[in-house]
């Protein structure tokens, strides 16, 4: 039995990692030795001067490792610490065609085709960053404030906000229910109309919307409010899969309190591609597509077997002034981002910072489209446990630079993992 255990543990990557953790902790293996092993086994490419500094002690192991992480010699996927996964979906908002669907980390599918590379497959199975799990189509999180456009349409169509000029006062706290709910801005936003509330991501405005939706004639009824809000989530396609031709997780509309559900919390849970379909409908003012990754299927002679042109699921028939107010608010969101100032294409978007638990950091989301004046594409980015929506927004900016030929690919793929000044103050919106 002992021999069997020993043989199995020798091939158990998880056990080995735990063992090394304790060996490093009690200095059986030093941090410097770990760094040297990474270099000697060609896992990192390092300037000779940095290796010399590590060897002679002028650089300690901690600073050496930090430098490797900043310069991306060691990637988030290799660390497998939060955040280590992300996804991006780009759609043509005029047709519903998916232009790009990206999940990070990825893996080499060629090693699993025409005969499986057993060693590589075992490595994938043990990888704590879970590269075989699609962050774009299977990973689900709360949408956070990116859901507020759904709530905005519900507010106007259900008549709980009487006009686009009606204001709701935000003092920083919503205290009509116990316990009270807070806005991300503790100082409050003052009087907010619908467009301002989107631009400033005012939670109190949307808490009040949820509270009003829940009035059933006898008083506050959260379930009644949820049923009213769900109609609009369904209109945007958020109660069904997006239509893409690969494995996708089922969406989940919130069944928890209406007040937090209107700001994209509660138990709302969606994939990145599902949010992309919703965003596409926002960008094109109400056309909801069943998305498609494929163009067409032909035989060896080029004869058409099947056309995969995306179908229209439904249209959202609301007054154009409501769309205009939503789009204006989304444009104002991006206008506040200093790192979008030099982009010659006008972008509109909505940030989202979604809380899942207190023992891990928040998810970072950014839903956007461009050009603002005449939308062509939408870009949806999510970084699970990514701290701030600004990180997702910067990723989207780089996608726009690439799409509109504003930067070379090499320029976008090189750089460091430093925290830019523009996002050093984290806003929980």
Regions found by a protein language model. Give the residues of each.
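Beta-lactam-recognizing serine transpeptidase/beta-lactamase-like catalytic domain environment
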Residues: 1-65, 69-72, 76-145, 150-385, ...
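A short acidic/glycine-rich loop-to-helix N-cap element
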Residues: 389-395
């Amino acid at each position: 039995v002992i021999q069997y255990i020993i043989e199995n543990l020798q091939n158990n990557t998880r056990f080995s990692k735990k063992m090394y953790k304790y060996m490093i902790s009690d200095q059986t293996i030093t941090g410097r030795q770990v760094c040297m092993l990474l270099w000697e086994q060609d896992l990192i490419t390092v300037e000779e001067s940095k290796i010399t500094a590590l060897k002679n002690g002028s650089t300690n192991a901690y600073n050496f490792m930090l430098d490797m992480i900043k310069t991306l010699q060691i990637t988030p996927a290799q660390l497998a610490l939060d955040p280590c996964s992300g996804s991006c979906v780009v759609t043509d908002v005029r047709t519903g065609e998916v232009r790009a669907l990206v999940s990070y980390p990825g893996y080499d599918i060629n090693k699993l085709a025409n005969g499986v590379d057993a060693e590589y497959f075992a490595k994938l199975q043990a990888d704590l960053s879970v590269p075989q799990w699609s962050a774009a189509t299977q990973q689900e999180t709360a949408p956070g404030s990116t859901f507020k456009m759904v709530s905005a349409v519900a507010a106007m169509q259900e008549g709980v906000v009487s006009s686009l000029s009606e204001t709701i006062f935000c003092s920083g706290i919503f205290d009509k229910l116990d316990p009270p709910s807070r806005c991300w801005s503790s100082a409050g936003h003052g009087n907010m109309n619908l467009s301002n509330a989107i631009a400033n991501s005012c939670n109190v405005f949307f808490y009040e919307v949820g509270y009003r939706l829940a009035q059933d004639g006898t008083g506050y009824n959260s379930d009644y409010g949820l049923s009213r809000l769900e109609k609009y989530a369904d209109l945007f396609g958020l109660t069904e899969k997006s239509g893409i031709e690969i494995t996708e997780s089922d969406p989940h509309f919130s069944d928890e309190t209406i007040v937090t559900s209107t700001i994209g919390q509660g138990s709302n849970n969606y994939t990145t591609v599902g949010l992309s379909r919703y965003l596409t409908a926002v960008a094109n003012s109400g056309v909801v597509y069943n998305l498609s990754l494929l163009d067409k299927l032909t035989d060896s002679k080029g004869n058409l077997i099947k056309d995969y042109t995306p179908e229209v699921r439904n249209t959202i028939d609301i007054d154009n002034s409501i769309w205009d107010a939503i789009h204006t608010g989304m444009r104002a969101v991006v206008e506040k981002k200093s790192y979008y100032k030099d982009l010659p294409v006008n972008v509109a978007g909505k940030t989202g910072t979604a809380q899942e638990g207190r023992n891990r950091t928040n998810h970072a989301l950014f839903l956007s489209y461009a050009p603002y004046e005449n939308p062509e594409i939408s870009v949806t980015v999510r970084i699970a446990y990514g701290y701030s929506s600004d990180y997702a927004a910067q990723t989207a900016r780089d996608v726009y630079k690439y799409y509109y030929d504003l930067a070379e690919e090499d320029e976008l793929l090189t750089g460091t993992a430093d925290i830019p000044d523009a996002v050093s103050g984290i806003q929980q919106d």
